[in-house]
């Protein structure tokens, strides 16, 4: 499980270094293989260990090709999906297309989201987390049925 937000740099070749606290698990459990794609609702990337992506892929496969909304999700998530391998220095290369989508520059945020990571442009992350915290303390959260039974 991946958790926490880490500020990391992206080098001139478009590589990011996975934090050392995750590397052993990622190599042992997932052989350092990933799939990176775009988030369809946010200006960030989603980085899945390959095995976790294969689960998502099966869900995408189950969607209807004849329903326009479902087809859009398939097209975007599968169309941008790019395999990445972690090198011996713990780095992965993000394609120019993916970097452009998320407007990634030098400083980025790698955010653990249980079975995957989100990759954000630093300023976009700060903006998003501020919005999330504001909504989290509002009445809007009280109306979500799934959250009513969540005990933290």
From Swiss-Prot:
GO terms for cellular component: cytoplasm; nucleoid. It holds the Pfam family MraZ. GO terms for biological process: negative regulation of DNA-templated transcription initiation. Coiled coil: none annotated. Residues 5-52, 81-124 form the SpoVT-AbrB domain. This is Transcriptional regulator MraZ. Belongs to the MraZ family. InterPro entries: MraZ, MraZ_C, MraZ_dom, MraZ_N, MraZ_sf, SpoVT-AbrB_dom, SpoVT-AbrB_sf. Keywords: Cytoplasm, DNA-binding, Repeat, Transcription, Transcription regulation. CDD domains: MraZ_C, MraZ_N. It is found in: Cytoplasm, Nucleoid. HAMAP family: MraZ (MF_01008). GO terms for molecular function: DNA-binding transcription factor activity; transcription cis-regulatory region binding. The lineage of its organism: Bacteria, Pseudomonadati, Pseudomonadota, Gammaproteobacteria, Pasteurellales. Forms oligomers. The gene is mraZ. PANTHER family: TRANSCRIPTIONAL REGULATOR MRAZ (PTHR34701:SF1).
């Amino acid at each position: 499980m991946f958790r926490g937000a880490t500020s990391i740099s992206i080098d001139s070749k478009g590589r990011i270094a996975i934090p050392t606290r995750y590397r052993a698990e990622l190599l042992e459990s997932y052989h350092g293989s990933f799939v990176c794609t775009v988030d369809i609702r946010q200006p960030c990337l989603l980085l899945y260990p390959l095995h976790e992506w294969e689960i998502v892929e099966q869900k995408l496969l189950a969607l209807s090709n004849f329903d326009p909304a479902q087809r859009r999700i398939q097209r975007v998530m599968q169309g941008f999906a790019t395999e990445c391998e972690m090198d011996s220095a713990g780095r992965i290369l993000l394609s120019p297309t993916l970097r452009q989508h998320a407007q990634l520059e030098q400083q980025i945020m790698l955010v653990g989201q249980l079975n995957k990571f989100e990759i954000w442009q630093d300023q976009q992350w700060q903006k998003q987390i501020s919005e999330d915290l504001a909504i989290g303390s509002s009445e809007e959260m009280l109306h979500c049925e799934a959250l009513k039974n969540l005990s933290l």
